């Protein structure tokens, strides 16, 4: 865990496989009472999520927060759009980078920090299939090197 980070509730491992992460930033999430209870219970899925900048606001879409079991009538729709809290300058910078370079905003992880739900957003560029194969090859080569080094060190 990085400095100042709280309890990690959910991670989007597929994001680092499908995208090249250029920059990350922390954003607050606007949630209802039953949603924050579900998040604290780790009942959240970031897999297909993405964020968009619309009218000077950042919105999180396609993130599934399961309905709280004891929430009855107060439960919200599981995949509704949720507002993210960022400073105005951060939003303007993101908007420029997204429009100019064809990048996207991907949720990387959700954690609880000082009692508040925070989202780590990644400014990302999509990988092509051959980029993914290169990443896999590089990872396997590093594993092989580590395996050989371990064998040498044990002798």
From Swiss-Prot:
Pfam name, any one: SmpB
PROSITE patterns: SSRP
Protein name, per record: SsrA-binding protein
Chief location: cytoplasm
Gene behind this protein: smpB
Intracellular or extracellular location(s): Cytoplasm
Alphabetical list of HAMAP family matching this protein: SmpB
Record bears the keyword Membrane: no
């Amino acid at each position: 865990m990085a400095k100042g980070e709280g309890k990690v509730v959910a991670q989007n491992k597929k994001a680092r496989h499908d995208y090249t992460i250029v920059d990350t930033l922390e954003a607050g999430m606007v949630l209802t009472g039953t949603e924050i209870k579900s998040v604290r219970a780790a009942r959240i899925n970031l897999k297909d999520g993405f964020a968009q900048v619309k009218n000077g606001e950042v919105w999180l879409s396609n993130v599934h927060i399961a309905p709280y079991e004891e929430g009855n009538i107060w439960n919200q729709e599981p995949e509704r759009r949720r507002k993210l809290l960022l400073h105005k300058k951060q939003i303007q910078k993101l908007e420029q980078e997204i429009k100019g370079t064809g990048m996207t905003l991907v949720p990387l992880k959700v954690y609880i920090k000082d009692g508040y739900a925070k989202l780590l957003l990644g400014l990302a560029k999509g990988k092509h299939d051959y980029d993914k194969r290169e990443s896999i090859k590089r990872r396997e080569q590093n594993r092989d090197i580590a395996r050989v080094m371990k064998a040498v060190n044990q002798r």
